[in-house]
């Protein structure tokens, strides 16, 4: 190793931004998520909607990737993808999924566990029609997760579809869609001094939500 390599064991800082107390909690987890989301938006966090999505393949091997959250409400959280992608293939045989929001600037993170269900065509078409035209073209151009020789291959395919759809609206590809994550549990983490972080977990039960504090 280079003598001037970074000593990562000594990289640390104290988390002193805020506390999370039981009195701060809401009855429903999505209400607290919306509050934190608005606070993150007010703080102008970069890439606010970026979320890490974890799935597993048929051998149990986990995979993660970053996607963009496109909607959330009491019914769950929504993201869109190529239905031939690795994540979509995983969800086809195991719909269990985990989402992670890393809002480092606010010393916060949110972890979601749930089940992903494919969106109805009408909802997908409504969102696809709102995308910028180049994003619509890229949905056609990329066979997500497949092997390609060079970036030039991808660009060439993009230009081909850009020319093909040069007039009128870009249609929705049959292989493109979205998922709604129906939430079973949601954990809220607020960094604390001396590593005494605040963690609360909401878990769905028959009568609503059970809320517990977790040790850091």
Curated annotation (Swiss-Prot):
Alphabetic keyword roster: Flavoprotein, FMN, Oxidoreductase, Pyridoxine biosynthesis
Binding site for substrate: 12-15, 70, 127, 131, 135, 195-197
Function statement: Catalyzes the oxidation of either pyridoxine 5'-phosphate (PNP) or pyridoxamine 5'-phosphate (PMP) into pyridoxal 5'-phosphate (PLP).
Gene name of this polypeptide: pdxH
One Pfam family of this chain: PNP_phzG_C
E.C. numbers: 1.4.3.5
Organism of derivation: Baumannia cicadellinicola subsp. Homalodisca coagulata
Entry superkingdom: Bacteria
Family of the protein in this entry: Belongs to the pyridoxamine 5'-phosphate oxidase family.
Pathway: Cofactor metabolism; pyridoxal 5'-phosphate salvage; pyridoxal 5'-phosphate from pyridoxamine 5'-phosphate: step 1/1; Cofactor metabolism; pyridoxal 5'-phosphate salvage; pyridoxal 5'-phosphate from pyridoxine 5'-phosphate: step 1/1
PANTHER family according to UniProt: PYRIDOXINE-5'-PHOSPHATE OXIDASE (PTHR10851:SF0), PYRIDOXINE-5-PHOSPHATE OXIDASE (PTHR10851)
Presence of the UniProt keyword Oxidoreductase in the record: yes
Any one GO molecular-function label of the UniProt entry: pyridoxamine phosphate oxidase activity
Example of a GO biological process term: pyridoxine biosynthetic process
Name of the featured protein: Pyridoxine/pyridoxamine 5'-phosphate oxidase
Cofactor section: FMN
Binding site for FMN: 65-70, 80-81, 86-87, 109, 144-145, 189, 199
Subunit composition and interactions: Homodimer.
Cofactor: binding comment: Binds 1 FMN per subunit.
Gene3D superfamilies per record: Electron Transport, Fmn-binding Protein, Chain A (2.30.110.10)
Reactions catalysed: pyridoxamine 5'-phosphate + O2 + H2O = pyridoxal 5'-phosphate + H2O2 + NH4(+); pyridoxine 5'-phosphate + O2 = pyridoxal 5'-phosphate + H2O2
Coiled coil: none
């Amino acid at each position: 190793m280079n003598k001037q390599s970074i000593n990562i064991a000594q990289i640390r800082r104290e988390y002193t931004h805020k506390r999370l107390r039981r009195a701060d909690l809401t009855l429903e987890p999505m209400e607290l998520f919306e509050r934190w989301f608005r606070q993150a938006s007010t703080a102008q966090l970069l890439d606010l909607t970026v979320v890490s999505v974890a799935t597993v393949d048929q051998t149990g091997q986990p995979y993660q990737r970053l996607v963009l959250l496109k909607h959330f409400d009491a019914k769950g959280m929504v993201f869109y993808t190529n239905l031939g992608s690795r994540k979509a293939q995983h969800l086809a045989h195991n719909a269990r999924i985990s989402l992670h929001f890393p809002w480092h600037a606010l010393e916060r993170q949110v972890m979601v566990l749930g089940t992903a269900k494919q969106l109805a065509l009408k909802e997908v078409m409504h969102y696809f029609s709102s995308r910028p035209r180049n994003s619509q073209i890229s949905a056609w151009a990329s066979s997500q997760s497949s092997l390609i020789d060079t970036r030039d291959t991808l660009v060439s395919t993009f230009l081909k579809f850009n020319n093909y759809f040069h007039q009128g609206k870009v249609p929705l590809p049959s292989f493109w869609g979205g998922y709604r994550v129906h939430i079973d549990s949601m954990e809220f983490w607020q960094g604390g001094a001396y590593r005494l972080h605040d963690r609360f977990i909401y878990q769905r039960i028959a009568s609503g939500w059970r809320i517990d504090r977790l040790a850091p």
